[in-house]
Structure formats: structure tokens, C-alpha cells
Amino acid sequence: MFTENLLFYKEESLIMAFIDTIKERAKADKKTIVLPESMDKRTYEAAEKILKEGIANLVIIGTPEEIEKYGKGYDISGATIVDPFNDPNKQKYIDKFVELRSKKGVTPEMAKEQMEKDYMYYACLMCKCGDADGAVSGACTTGSFGACRIKRISKAIPHKKSPDRQGA
């Protein structure tokens, strides 16, 4: 029993050390991450922790009503809030969406409607246009749901090799 507990403790310590290493690397090269699921309290819980620890710059996509309703009680004052209905960059994202999906018959009206209905598209387009480095979802949707949107929008994003993995 003692040996099992000791092994568990060592595994847990290694995991925590690994997580701490990831956090330190993230802080050293702070990226802008979009959180498109503003209708889940877990988004705000995570955002508050990330902002408090200085791990990343955050963008939360949501209407003022969604932010007020679901984000109440969380300190997200360091995050940028993007209202997908009133964002000054919206037309740029619509144009990019149409450019990428015009062969599939996507019109500006369809792009606008899709972006207002599904914030993951908005997040992907922010990344595609260089306004964010990445997006995290999965609180309200499955991984395959998010991956489908990423594939539709991000297929033309060039792969960046990290400096320590030039041969990868």
C-alpha cells in the first residue's frame, strides 16, 4: 500500500512539474488565445486563472448579454471582449470566410450568419487573419465539432516549425 501511494505521489509530482514547465514556456512567449464559448461558466473560470497567472492574452467572443450572464463573478478584466455582432473587424472576417469557402457556394450573407451563430468560426477567422494565435473550445462542443470548423477555415494556415524541431 505504501509503495502504491509513493508511486502515485511521484507520478502526480511529475505531472505537476510538466504542467509548470508548460506554463512557464507560455508566459515567456505569451500568445493571444480566443475562447469562443462564452455561454459556459467554465470558460470564465479558465479565463480568470489564465489571466491571473499571466499565461496568455485572452479574447472572449460573446455578446454583452452573454458575458454579463455567464461571466458574472469572474475577474476577466484583462481579457478582450469581442461582440460578434458589433466587431469593427467583422467585415474582414466575412471577406476571408467567403474567400476560403466561395468554391462551396458561401456568400457574404451566409458567412455573416454562420459567424454569428457559431463563434468557433469567428475564432478560426481571427486566427486565419492573424488577429489571434489560437483558439480553445470543447466546453460546449465536442472536439470533432470544433475540428470540423477549424478544417473548413484553417486548412490554408501555413505550418510553423518550432525552433527546437526544425526537422519535424
Which ranges hold each PLM region?
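Anion-binding alpha/beta catalytic cores of soluble intermediary-metabolism enzymes, centered on
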Residues: 15-168
